[in-house]
Design a protein with these regions (language model features):
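Acidic, PIN/NYN-like endoribonuclease modules and their adjacent C-terminal/linker elements
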Residues: 1-3, 99, 103-132
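Short, well-structured N-terminal submotif of metal-dependent ribonuclease cores
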Residues: 1-38, 50-61, 130-132
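A generic structural signal for short hydrophobic patches within well-formed alpha-helices
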Residues: 13-14, 43, 79, 116-117
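A general structural signal for well-ordered alpha-helical segments in protein cores
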Residues: 23, 43, 59-62, 75, ...
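General small-molecule cofactor/ligand-binding pocket signal
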Residues: 37, 72, 125
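Active-site neighborhoods of divalent-metal-dependent phosphate/nucleic-acid chemistry enzymes
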Residues: 71-112
Length: 132
């Protein structure tokens, strides 16, 4: 049986990268590279966060890793689906693009972002209020 496709949201990448308690739980859920879909908007968000938090060299290494996964560019079909999901679920633009990418590709979304709570096709690993 083939492992399911998963889109890993920026919030989950960050928890995994910093090695938090939540990140350790997530590491068991992280897909192999061939099942890991990476929207280009996630690469943008990750790059911004990484350069700010750890510097360009480590940012380049993580982005290089994401490029070994299945990178999914924003195309018209995903953009229009994102617009629908934005309106329907009141998501921020980047969140709508990430969620639309997962829905368009028939993948599960792995996230720590409570904005996705209750949406179909989402595996939410919510941050404990003590983690904040």
């Amino acid at each position: 049986m083939t492992a399911p496709l998963r889109v890993v949201d920026t919030s989950a990448w960050i928890e995994w990268l910093i090695g938090s308690a939540l990140g350790k739980k997530l590491s068991e859920q992280f897909p192999d590279k061939l099942q890991c879909l990476v929207p280009t908007i996630v690469q943008l968000e990750l790059s911004k966060w990484l350069v700010r938090e750890v510097g360009e060299e480590q940012a380049d290494q993580v982005i290089a890793y994401t490029q070994k996964c299945v990178v999914v560019p924003l195309d018209t079909a995903i953009a229009l689906l994102a617009a629908d999901l934005y309106r329907e679920h009141k998501l921020a633009t980047a969140d709508a693009i990430v969620y639309a990418t997962a829905r368009h590709r028939g993948a599960e979304l792995l996230t720590c972002d409570a904005h996705f709570d209750g949406l179909p096709g989402v595996a939410l690993y919510a941050k404990d209020h003590r983690d904040l």
